[in-house]
């Protein structure tokens, strides 16, 4: 293994960036190329500047000129071209991560590094003077970019006019990756002013950052040049460009805002952006600050790898965000994304971060502001439900991959040592080690970046709770005021650093505004990863009228969980009102006695005051002696935590019925799934029917009621759950079983109408199948669905109905006749009806497509379920066709999801290779990233599993990709995540197993050649045994888990092939069998060398015939006589030749034959002649007497196929070596 290279110590950048000009004069869609020139104006810090480091990747540099007169030499070096591909032996992520971080640090602009090194020539020394500008002019070109710039060109099959109208290009830089399309200082910490010039065809529009100054036609009148100016200093990563034949729409409410879209999409654009001006007004009013730039542009493009990306004065958004006025569901999503992009104009584009470790601040503040706008726009319930779901996603990520450290630039301060608290002094925070380096943006997982943004938002919310929202907004306002003042100055004033924000600067700003020192808070939640996890139990003490609480932190040693010290809010709802108590958590076990303010008066008082101030009537008959109705922990979600609360079912029911906070209602619904009683059933039913409940709570209650009903199936009485509720809300007055015309004007009922059928489809009878009443109900919904008078589309509703059909499916229980194919005749009645409906809808979608092909997406997933449950042949062809480039993105992702699941369950190596090819070569970056996430979340195999897909060539391919993807950082880190999901951080097991097997084969070859030269035949004697290596010794180095037998299910289909050694055996039938996956005991034999026990031609011919019969028997059509063993590349061979077994007497042989005969007779139920069997036994006995050392393969050559099969099935471990040539 190569030693890890050391990054040389480099001082801070010896110059300041003052201004930059970017001029792209040749943008060719035909060649997918760019020709341009940049001019950087720098201000040296001293006269000793001799080496200038800049960032540039995948560019061809033609010349570098200083001050237009002096040619300078330059060198280019990109360590990402080959990170550590030479590490053939290790192939371990723990080795790769070190080299990965080193490569990133070699080109990190924050520490004055870069790919392009410009050497100042001696004649240029006089130009370098401290405080005076130096212009660096670089001519470059870019051809067929792999990343950074994306050209969208329709296929040549379309007509020329459509191709020209739809062709466009845009920059899609992942974080700081502007170096991929022009030379620059690619750092968030180096803002400067800009002049941007783009020459394009006369019928195209170039949209870029800053204010459009003028558009000038070229002398030949074939092209025009767009001139933009950015007078406010911004950094290179926040510069973007989009070129195409865009339709332009000026916002009627704010003329400074302009929107651009592709031809034909203007009506959708107008509807989508009609409320965007409200976001600007909200942020300006909340922050008491004007929008920091003079204009804002929003461009909608195709094949963008994210939903939206914010840059200085502009955003590039996906065309998939556009929707008409008839769409309900997409409105929430699009409005949230666009409002977040506007918030990032304040923090992220105007105010940027000092370093990668400070990025959490800009991301967190922008997300926090977006949340405030969403609360105003969609309501408090929607906001709190969103916060709860985001918290759950952060907790889930940290517990799966490890704690998220927001600021990794410096470790937290050590804990204070006190004589009274030695445990706190001795306790040491667990070191968080990820499989990727977190010190560089170009090495971290995209999943980590997304989870970091969510966690950063929660940290800002925690700050809001500690200092108050008003003071927190003042801190934001102070930073914006300083930055606005600095942006109007020249670089000589030295104030541009106020455009940057860091953790330490933020701490000082909070102290300046509030007088509170937040250093301890930052150490606890920003510089330390992980979250808290609490378990709460309570007991009521009747004598003392106290509630005895016990709060435990039992999971502090698990991944992603840390011990919490500090205040914790406990809220008790008592008979006399809501009471909050703050407990101080100082250890992993805290016990506290809280005196109750109420006494048990359940028969005297029914009006209960709630925390909202209202009083409600409660039925207290279910209560015990405790006056506490329910208990909540950290109700305002001011901690990063996970909760386990234990309380009786009636308390959860009270909480669900009467608590007004939606987060508490979600908790109660989740907890009530463990209490399948009539009271729980009634509480969930009342919640679904209550119009006062938030619509998401009602939908969640419907899904929870399904699980409760399935546990109560034996005692359930009446119609299926929720059937009467649905008919009550949506059935006709005269005939409730006939659904009314669709009317989605009430959004709460709309979401409920989508959720209830899916929930009902999960109901099961005592036999584990969907009730017939539910099946009829669902098909009636399709039959009577009528949307002609509805103002809104029913695409999402129909997609939900198709999903409900899929939920009704259960695995096949009938046994088909062996060898027969699955046809429509063999389908059950319900499965056939489902298949017919899905096929009809899928075909209809090709002529009348729904919005985003939502119905087709659901149909593909149902077809995959039909395959998994055995109703359809498991074939991937339909998914491959829908996953091809050119299909709508959402439909492609759905097909890829089905393909990933198919590969995991039924796939072969070529199916997995097809997915890897898509991952590496698909033209759409959004599809590549989505496929990577699907493979990571549902990997084809894991390190612990023993899969036939786990092969060395797959390791080689993935290892090559993560080492040879220098430009696409996002895809490279995605494949690193996939590599970890498959193999972990250590060396892949298949490489070790392959080496062990090769080593064993070499030993066997050497031994066979040596034995053959001395004896001329294979005779097992005491002398020869000492010379033969024992295979078990070669397995000592195998991982322990590979030696544990496990039950493995093997599926064989008519078109499937198994690899046995170097042979590919194609099966002629289809079946699933389960075998014991353990080492196969075979003869001392090399799989590539023939057994040289028989020398005569006649004996060799007989051996070949016996092996042929063995092969035929292994794959015979009779299902009762076949036993299949999966023998792959990593199969281990153990010798079954023991001297005592081969020299056993006739009595042992007779006893064994009787046993095998008995098994044979029982298994095949055939009638055989006893005399014939005796003759065969006698003949076999005579042969054994003639040569007791003969190989077992020859001893069985005269056996009939039936007898041979019975022996094989009765003793699979004694199989002879199979000659399948």
UniProtKB/Swiss-Prot annotation:
Return the Polar residues bias intervals.
1027-1037
Q: Report the principal subcellular site.
A: nucleus
Identify the InterPro entries for this entry. Aminopeptidase_N-like_N_sf, ARM-type_fold, Peptidase_M1_dom, Peptidase_M4/M1_CTD_sf, TAF2
**Keyword annotations from UniProtKB, A to Z:** Nucleus, Phosphoprotein, Transcription, Transcription regulation
Does this UniProt record's set of keywords contain Transcription regulation? Answer: yes
Q: What GO biological process, any one, is recorded here?
A: transcription by RNA polymerase II
Cell compartments where the protein resides: Nucleus
Provide the assembly information: Belongs to the TFIID complex which is composed of TATA binding protein (Tbp) and a number of TBP-associated factors (TAFs). Interacts with Tbp, Taf1, Taf11 and Taf12.
What name does the UniProt record give this protein? Transcription initiation factor TFIID subunit 2
Task: Give the classification, highest ranks.
Answer: Eukaryota, Metazoa, Ecdysozoa, Arthropoda, Hexapoda
């Amino acid at each position: 293994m190569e030693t890890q290279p050391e990054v040389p110590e480099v001082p801070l950048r010896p110059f300041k960036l003052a201004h930059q000009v970017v001029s792209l004069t040749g943008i060719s869609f035909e060649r997918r190329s760019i020709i341009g020139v940049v001019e950087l104006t720098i201000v040296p810090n001293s006269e000793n500047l001799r080496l200038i480091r800049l960032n540039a990747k995948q560019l061809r540099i033609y010349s570098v000129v200083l001050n237009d007169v002096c040619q300078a030499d330059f060198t280019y070096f990109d360590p990402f071209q080959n990170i550590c591909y030479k590490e053939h032996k290790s192939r371990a992520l723990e080795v790769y991560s070190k080299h990965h971080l080193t490569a990133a640090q070699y080109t990190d602009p924050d520490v004055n590094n870069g790919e392009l090194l410009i050497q100042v020539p001696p004649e240029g020394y006089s130009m370098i003077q401290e405080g005076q500008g130096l212009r660096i002019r670089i001519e470059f070109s870019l051809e067929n970019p792999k990343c950074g710039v994306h050209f969208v060109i329709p296929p040549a099959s379309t007509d020329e006019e459509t191709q020209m109208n739809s062709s466009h290009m845009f920059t899609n830089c992942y974080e700081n990756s502007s170096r991929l399309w022009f030379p620059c200082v690619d750092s968030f910490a180096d803002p400067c002013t800009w002049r941007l010039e783009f020459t394009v065809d006369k019928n195209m529009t170039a949209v870029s950052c800053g204010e459009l100054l003028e558009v000038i036609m070229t002398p030949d009148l074939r092209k025009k040049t767009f001139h933009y100016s950015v007078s406010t200093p911004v950094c290179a990563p926040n510069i973007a460009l989009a070129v195409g034949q865009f339709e332009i729409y000026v916002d009627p409410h704010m003329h400074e805002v302009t929107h651009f879209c592709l031809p034909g999409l203007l009506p959708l654009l107008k509807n989508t952006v009609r409320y965007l001006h409200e976001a600007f007004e909200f942020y300006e009013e909340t922050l008491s600050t004007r929008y920091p730039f003079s204009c804002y542009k929003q461009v909608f493009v195709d094949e963008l790898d994210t939903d939206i990306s914010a840059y200085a004065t502009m955003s590039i958004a996906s065309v998939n965000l556009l929707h008409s006025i008839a769409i309900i569901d997409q409105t929430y999503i699009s409005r949230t994304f666009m409002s977040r992009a506007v918030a990032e104009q304040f923090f992220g584009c105007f105010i940027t971060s000092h370093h990668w470790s400070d990025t959490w601040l800009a991301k967190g503040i922008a997300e926090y502001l977006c949340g405030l706008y969403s609360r105003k726009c969609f309501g408090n319930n929607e906001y709190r439900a969103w916060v709860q779901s985001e918290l759950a996603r952060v907790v889930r990520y940290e517990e799966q991959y490890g704690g998220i450290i927001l600021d990794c630039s410096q470790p937290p301060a050590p804990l204070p040592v006190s004589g009274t608290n030695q445990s706190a002094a001795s306790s040491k925070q667990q070191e968080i080690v990820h499989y990727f380096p977190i010190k560089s943006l170009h090495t971290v997982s995209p999943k980590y970046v997304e989870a970091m943004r969510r966690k950063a938002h929660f940290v800002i919310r925690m700050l809001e709770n500690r200092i108050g929202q008003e003071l927190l907004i003042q801190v934001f306002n102070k930073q914006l005021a300083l930055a606005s003042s600095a942006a109007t100055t020249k670089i000589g004033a030295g104030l541009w650093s106020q455009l940057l924000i860091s953790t330490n600067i933020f701490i000082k700003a909070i102290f300046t505004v509030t007088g509170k020192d937040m250093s301890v808070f930052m150490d606890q939640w920003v510089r330390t990863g992980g979250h808290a996890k609490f378990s709460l139990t309570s007991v009521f003490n009747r004598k003392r009228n106290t509630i005895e609480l016990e709060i435990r932190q039992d999971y502090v040693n698990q991944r992603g969980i840390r011990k919490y010290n500090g205040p914790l809010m406990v809220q008790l709802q008592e008979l006399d009102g809501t009471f909050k108590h703050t407990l101080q958590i100082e250890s992993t076990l805290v016990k506290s006695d809280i005196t109750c303010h109420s006494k048990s008066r359940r028969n005297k008082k029914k009006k209960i005051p709630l925390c909202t101030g209202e009083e409600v009537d409660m039925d207290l008959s279910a209560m015990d002696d405790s006056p506490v109705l329910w208990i909540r922990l950290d109700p305002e979600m001011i901690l990063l935590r996970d909760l386990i609360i234990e309380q009786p079912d009636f308390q959860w029911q009270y909480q669900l019925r009467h608590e007004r906070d939606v987060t508490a209602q979600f908790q109660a619904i989740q907890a009530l799934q463990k209490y399948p009683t009539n009271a729980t059933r009634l509480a969930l039913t009342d919640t679904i029917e209550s119009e006062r409940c938030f619509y998401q709570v009602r939908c969640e209650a419907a899904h929870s009621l399904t699980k409760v009903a399935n546990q109560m199936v034996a005692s359930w009485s009446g119609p299926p759950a929720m059937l009467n509720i649905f008919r009550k809300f949506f059935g006709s007055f005269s005939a409730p079983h006939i659904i009314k015309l669709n009317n989605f004007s009430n959004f709460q009922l709309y979401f409920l109408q989508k959720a209830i059928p899916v929930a009902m489809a999960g109901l099961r009878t005592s036999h584990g199948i969907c009730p017939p009443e539910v099946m009829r109900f669902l098909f009636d919904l399709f039959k009577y669905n009528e949307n002609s008078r509805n103002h809104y589309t029913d695409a999402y509703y129909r997609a939900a109905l198709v999903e409900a059909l899929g939920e009704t499916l259960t695995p096949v229980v009938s046994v088909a006749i062996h060898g027969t194919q699955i046809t429509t005749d063999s389908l059950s009645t319900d499965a056939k009806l489902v298949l017919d409906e899905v096929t009809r809808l899928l075909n209809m979608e090709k002529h009348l497509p729904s919005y985003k092909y939502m119905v087709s997406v659901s149909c593909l997933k149902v077809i995959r379920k039909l395959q998994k449950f055995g109703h359809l042949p498991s074939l991937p062809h339909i998914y491959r066709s829908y996953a091809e480039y050119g299909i709508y993105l959402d439909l492609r992702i759905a097909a890829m999801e089905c393909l990933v699941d198919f590969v995991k369950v039924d796939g072969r190596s070529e199916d997995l290779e097809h997915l890897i090819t898509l991952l590496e070569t698909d033209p759409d970056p959004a599809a590549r990233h989505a496929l990577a996430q699907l493979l990571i979340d549902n990997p084809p195999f894991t390190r612990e599993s023993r899969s036939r897909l786990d092969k060395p060539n797959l390791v080689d391919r993935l290892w090559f990709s993560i080492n040879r993807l220098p430009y696409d950082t996002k895809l490279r880190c995605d494949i690193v995540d996939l590599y970890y999901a498959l193999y972990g951080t250590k060396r892949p097991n298949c490489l070790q197993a392959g080496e062990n097997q090769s080593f064993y084969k070499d030993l066997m070859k050497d031994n066979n050649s040596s034995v053959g030269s001395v004896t001329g035949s294979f005779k097992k004697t005491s002398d020869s045994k000492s010379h033969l290596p024992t295979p078990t010794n070669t397995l000592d180095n195998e991982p322990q888990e590979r030696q544990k037998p496990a039950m493995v299910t093997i599926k064989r289909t008519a078109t499937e092939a198994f690899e046995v050694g170097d042979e590919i055996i194609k099966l002629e039938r289809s079946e699933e069998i389960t075998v014991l996956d353990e080492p196969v005991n075979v003869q001392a034999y090399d799989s590539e060398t023939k057994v040289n026990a028989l020398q005569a031609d006649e004996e060799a011919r007989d051996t070949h015939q016996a092996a042929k019969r063995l092969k035929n028997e292994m794959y015979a059509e009779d299902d009762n006589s076949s036993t299949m063993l999966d023998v792959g590349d990593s199969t281990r061979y153990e010798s079954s030749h023991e001297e005592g077994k081969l020299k056993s007497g006739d009595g042992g042989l007779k006893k064994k034959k009787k046993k095998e005969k008995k098994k044979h007779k029982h298994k095949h139920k055939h009638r055989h002649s006893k005399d014939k069997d005796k003759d065969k036994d006698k003949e076999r006995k005579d042969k054994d007497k003639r040569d007791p050392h003969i190989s077992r393969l020859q001893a069985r050559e005269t056996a009939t196929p039936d007898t041979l099969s019975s022996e094989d099935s009765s003793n699979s471990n004694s199989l002879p070596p199979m000659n399948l040539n």
